Amino acid sequence: MKCKKQLLVIFFAYFLVVNESEAIFGSLFSLGSKLLPSVFKLFSRKKQRALMKRDLEDIMDPYQKNLKLDRYLRRLAMD
């Protein structure tokens, strides 16, 4: 009889521990599945911003030659 009670207590303790761990890991997984995509989007946005900033710097560079304008001026000079 004593052995049956011990086994019953062990079974219930194991059942509670497994249920709690399943709930904890389930909540961690759901949080992770929500957070990971947002983290990846954040890093990709930073890369896009850096590329856009570089493009703007290239456009605003006063020493950059405008090749189309040079071609038009050469045509005008030849005519």
Curated annotation (Swiss-Prot):
<dbReference type="GO" id="GO:0031640">
    <property type="term" value="P:killing of cells of another organism"/>
</dbReference>
<feature type="propeptide">
    <location>
        <begin position="49"/>
        <end position="79"/>
    </location>
</feature>
<keyword id="KW-0204">Cytolysis</keyword>
<keyword id="KW-1052">Target cell membrane</keyword>
<keyword id="KW-0732">Signal</keyword>
<keyword id="KW-0800">Toxin</keyword>
<keyword id="KW-0472">Membrane</keyword>
<keyword id="KW-1053">Target membrane</keyword>
<comment type="similarity">
    <text>Belongs to the non-disulfide-bridged peptide (NDBP) superfamily. Medium-length antimicrobial peptide (group 3) family. Ponericin-W subfamily.</text>
</comment>
<keyword id="KW-0929">Antimicrobial</keyword>
<dbReference type="GO" id="GO:0005576">
    <property type="term" value="C:extracellular region"/>
</dbReference>
<dbReference type="GO" id="GO:0090729">
    <property type="term" value="F:toxin activity"/>
</dbReference>
<keyword id="KW-0354">Hemolysis</keyword>
<keyword id="KW-0044">Antibiotic</keyword>
<dbReference type="GO" id="GO:0016020">
    <property type="term" value="C:membrane"/>
</dbReference>
<dbReference type="GO" id="GO:0044218">
    <property type="term" value="C:other organism cell membrane"/>
</dbReference>
<protein>
    <recommendedName>
        <fullName>Ponericin-W-like 32.1</fullName>
    </recommendedName>
</protein>
<dbReference type="GO" id="GO:0050832">
    <property type="term" value="P:defense response to fungus"/>
</dbReference>
<feature type="signal peptide">
    <location>
        <begin position="1"/>
        <end position="23"/>
    </location>
</feature>
<keyword id="KW-0295">Fungicide</keyword>
<dbReference type="GO" id="GO:0042742">
    <property type="term" value="P:defense response to bacterium"/>
</dbReference>
<keyword id="KW-0964">Secreted</keyword>
<comment type="function">
    <text>Antimicrobial peptide with potent activity against a range of Gram-positive and Gram-negative bacteria. Has high hemolytic activity against erythrocytes. May act by disrupting the integrity of the bacterial cell membrane.</text>
</comment>
